[in-house]
Amino acid sequence: MKVPPCFPSLPDADILCIEVISIEKGMSSTDQAAQVYQLRIWIRHISPQIWRRLLVRSDSTIAQLHDILQIAFGWRDEHLHRFLIRGKPYGIARSGGMSFDDNPHQVQLRDFHFRSKETLVYEYDLTDWWQHEIRLEQVLPLDPTKRYPLCVAGKRRGPLEDCGGPRAFMDLQDEYPLYKVLPQFAQMLLDHRDDLDDCQGELRRLAYWIVREDFDRRAVNRRLVEYSAGQTGEKGSSHAYSDTGDH
């Protein structure tokens, strides 16, 4: 390589180093190859644990991760939320709620360069205060035969919305054991068989405690597919993203 006149004293190796550094500094996050983050998420202060294992693209934004978690745990996105990442809050600003320094539709997960086993927190409903702990279990290569995001494991249904938070939820678990709920549910169906519309709310509440141990991973993945295809209006469809392949 011929040494340019502006660097008369630099050897060829130093020039190459300068060129590489310049290229790396000029790379944006969109220039980096996407990977897959395997995340394990659980709700704090709940026993038995309610948890999910998700595969999420590293180029997912904070806003997209919010939507994904809402779907994975069955939340309705009716309350304020925030992420706490290394002590700094992130999230989608809402009228009358918190404001954030960074645009959640632009900040990508890979921008943080998370280490394996590193954790962050997702808080939802700042009155009931559901705290979801998120741990990066491992970083995987992108599989072109799979569609992301993808739920690969989990246990138990997400809590009832507006039930009062973890402590109240634990008390309700004791208050509604299956052997009590099943007769109540059956009796209500009999008593209101001609006007079930009048007791839909109570029936749904009782039904939750009947099936609370069940987790329908396939149903979650169907919703995630709809979300990634931009078909789910209630959970961030304007920020949807997808990958090729089926699961």
Specify the residue positions occupied by each region the protein language model found.
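Extreme N-terminal basic, low-complexity initiation segments
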Residues: 2-6
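Short linear regulatory motifs enriched in tryptophan with gly/pro/ser
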Residues: 7, 11-247
